[in-house]
């Protein structure tokens, strides 16, 4: 026990080590506070949805006047959907920083609404906003290098190693004990602030333990690299430069090159292209005979084929029908997009076994439900809800049932938990 206490005292007597531990603690706290503030801001925005939707619906309802046309209601009313953050999302913001977490949809063509502004390429975990995942993935290795690069060379350069070898000591155990103390100190400085904030955010105990275990494993990886370099017998300056170069390659260059390789190996149609194709299909419907549009719609949705035929005047059921036909027209593009995104995500996850920084990001965002899979699941919930909206308004339009002001409040409401 005295030997362990001696290692702790010796580490704390080093100004560099003490300053590094203090700085790491401050950065960990700052990253956690930043993540909590960002998620609190999103929760506040989501909490305001109900009141804002009620105001918007009241305005649309007031403008409805004496009309009994459900098509006007379907066209002018927006219906909010939202993707609430998980308790752990403060630690790994992930996709929530680049993908919409609130989406207002109408009972018109959905794919253009979903894919508007979909210009990001988040399939591979790379450097992003400053959060706890960023700290662990990119900054923590630098602190490991700062404390471990001279774990042996410092003794050699001061001549203490020769003296220590003359004593009845096992040098391997001495350096192992020293490395353990330094890694434990780094783990505590990064993990203790996380533990406090995670408990305050009511994160599940299993997730807290998983994050702490993940951080410990990541520390061991970088500590192992440092020990491999230290045992080469180089001086401290060469060790530091070598380890810094390894950090650049493993944490920055490697993931960036892998990202380029994955994008080239698995081409994916951009979401903006899907939105454009859907709009082109919708706009082209104005030049197609209405009977052809309805025939195509009834072939796909036979439950509405008994609807009264169109008259000479404009009818919203034709308008909503060709919007749905537009969605159906781009369904193969959407399926290909989804498949490509999932393949890229799987490739990035597999790459995490070769590049630990990528694996760290993938694991953290997966636990926090802020990864691409969580975003795709939100899109699936939006599609399910949009189908409910369409069925609701179709029930009026395709049976020529009058739509009155109280019917606005009877429209389906989005359930984020479904």
Task: List the model feature ranges, each with a label.
Residues 22, 180, 184, 188, ...:
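Hydrophobic residues within alpha-helical transmembrane segments
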Residues 27, 31, 185, 189, ...:
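Alpha-helical transmembrane segments of multipass membrane proteins
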Residues 1-125, 240, 247-418:
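Transmembrane alpha-helical segments and their membrane-interface loop/helix boundaries
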Residues 127-158:
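Long, hydrophobic alpha-helical segments
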Residues 144-148, 224-225, 241:
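Hydrophobic/aromatic residues in alpha-helical transmembrane segments
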Residues 12-13, 146-187:
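Helix-loop-helix units of permease transmembrane domains in multi-pass membrane transporters
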Residues 211-233:
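Hydrophobic alpha-helical transmembrane segments of polytopic membrane proteins
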Residues 111-112, 173-202:
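Hydrophobic alpha-helical transmembrane segments that constitute the membrane-spanning cores
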């Amino acid at each position: 026990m005295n030997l362990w206490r001696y290692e702790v005292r010796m580490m704390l007597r080093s100004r560099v080590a003490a300053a590094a531990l203090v700085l790491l603690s401050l950065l960990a706290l700052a990253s956690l506070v930043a993540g909590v503030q960002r998620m609190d801001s999103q929760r506040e925005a989501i909490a305001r949805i109900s009141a804002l939707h009620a105001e918007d619906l009241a305005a649309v309802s007031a403008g409805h006047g004496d009309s009994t046309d459900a098509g006007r209601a379907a066209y002018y009313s927006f219906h909010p959907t939202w993707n609430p953050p998980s308790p752990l999302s403060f630690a790994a913001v992930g996709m929530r920083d680049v993908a919409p977490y609130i989406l207002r949809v109408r009972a018109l063509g959905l794919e253009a609404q979903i894919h508007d502004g979909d210009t990001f390429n988040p399939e591979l975990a790379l450097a992003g906003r400053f959060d706890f995942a960023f700290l662990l993935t990119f900054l923590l290795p630098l602190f490991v290098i700062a404390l471990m690069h001279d774990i042996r060379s410092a003794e050699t350069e001061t001549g203490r190693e020769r003296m220590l070898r003359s004593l009845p000591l096992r040098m391997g155990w001495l350096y192992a004990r020293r490395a353990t103390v330094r890694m434990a100190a780094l783990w505590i400085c990064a993990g203790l602030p996380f533990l406090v904030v995670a408990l305050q955010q009511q994160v599940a105990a299993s997730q807290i333990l998983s994050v702490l275990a993940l951080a410990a494993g990541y520390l061991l990886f970088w500590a192992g690299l440092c020990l491999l370099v230290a045992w080469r017998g180089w001086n401290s300056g060469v060790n530091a430069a070598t380890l810094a170069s390894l950090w650049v390659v493993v944490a920055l260059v490697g993931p960036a090159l892998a990202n380029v390789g994955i994008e080239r190996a698995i081409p994916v149609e951009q979401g903006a292209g899907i939105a454009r194709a859907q709009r082109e299909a919708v706009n082209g419907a104005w030049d197609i005979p209405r009977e052809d549009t309805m025939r195509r719609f009834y072939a796909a949705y036979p439950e509405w084929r008994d609807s009264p035929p169109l008259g000479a005047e404009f009818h919203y059921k034709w308008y909503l029908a060709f919007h749905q036909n537009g969605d159906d027209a781009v369904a193969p593009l959407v399926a290909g997009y989804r498949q490509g995104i999932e393949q890229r995500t799987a490739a990035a996850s597999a790459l995490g076994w070769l590049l630990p920084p990528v694996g760290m990001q993938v694991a953290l965002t997966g636990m926090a439900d802020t990864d691409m899979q969580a975003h795709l699941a939100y899109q699936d919930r939006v599609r399910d809800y949009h189908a409910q909206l369409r069925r609701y308004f179709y029930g009026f339009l395709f049976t020529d049932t009058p739509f009155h002001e109280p019917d606005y409040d009877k429209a389906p409401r989005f359930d984020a938990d479904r």
